[in-house]
Amino acid sequence: MERNSRIDSSGDLTQSADEDCFLDAPLLPSQKLQSVIRPHFHPVPTVCISILLALINLAYVTLAVVAFYFCLFSGKKKECNQSVAPFNLSTVLVISKLILWLLHVVNERFAHHHHCKAKNKGFLHLYRSTRHLKGLPLIIHSTGNAALLLILSVQDSISSNRQLYPCLILSVLLLELILSVICLIIYTVRIYRFNKRKPRPDIIEEEKINAYEGHVNPEIGFRHRASLEEVVEKQGDTIEYLKHHNALLSKQLLALTSNQD
């Protein structure tokens, strides 16, 4: 009994000494803690790229219409062929269309990268609401490429009708332009409004709304008008964000503590 009491007393002394060490440790400045817990807002830098891509789409279709008019309908076919030599007009059009499609691929990958970063920072609603929208222009142009290849493959079959071939190509290009520019404008407006609002992560915004309204947000659990897949997806994204945020917060706190030492 006496030995056990000595062990307990020594354990208590060790525990109290450890607690004193924690109490004597220097406190982190509140400004540094606030900067870690509430990081600065970083806008999604895809607005200018989307606007530039829409202008490139418009310029491409405009030049295609002008080229078809002067090469096929204005009687200046010889001068037009000399200006695009050693290629013909169809080859130049296909090469330009391929370059435009590659620009859409780069834009989609660029937007996807920054949307994943926004998702990791807690902007889950933005990621879900633009998940399909940011890739629609690429899908539209990929479908247009398939349509152009089909038209080019049957070019010899419709060579008897001189005006049908360019009209089909221009119809595909104009339809591509209208649909892709509409998607780009909707996406650009949505991202611009998001950057202008400078919101905090979704979880913090929901907590603020709950504290203001005084009741639990039903989206945390089950919503009557929400499907089970939406609820599971949202909860999974929330858990993933919390794990990422906790890991990042732990690293930053350890770095600040080591700097204090």
Swiss-Prot record:
The chain crosses the membrane at residues 51-71, 86-106, 135-155, 167-187. Its main location: membrane. It holds the Pfam family TMEM192. One of its GO terms (cellular component) is lysosomal membrane. It is a multi-pass membrane protein. Keywords: Endosome, Lysosome, Membrane, Transmembrane, Transmembrane helix. It is found in: Lysosome membrane; Late endosome. The keyword Transcription does not apply. The keyword Transmembrane applies. InterPro entries: TMEM192. Belongs to the TMEM192 family. Homodimer. This is Transmembrane protein 192. It comes from Xenopus laevis (African clawed frog).
